[in-house]
């Protein structure tokens, strides 16, 4: 694991962020897409209107945690020489005041733990999270 400072450019969805990574000594890796490793969030870019509401809530939560465009730390996992996942994104997690974003997103019901495999396995937890977010008033108008 390596830790880098980075600057948030854009929150794409609840588990994907575009960043500039400070490699040190004034060297920056620009415009990298980071997949937050270890979680799955509802899709915000989908035709399913109900899922989209929860996906947009996850995106908003992540954006509020990271701030508008701050410099943060991100821990990037590296298997061998491969720092990127199957879709070419850097795999990592962000640290906010010493806490991992993955933990916060799961605790608040905006994400579920996910380490590959079938997304069908995570669906039960997503449904529990939906009920929690509706009950707390985080997501409104989500009728199933």
What does each model-identified segment do?
Residues 1-144:
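Small beta-barrel nucleic-acid-binding modules, primarily SNase/OB-fold domains
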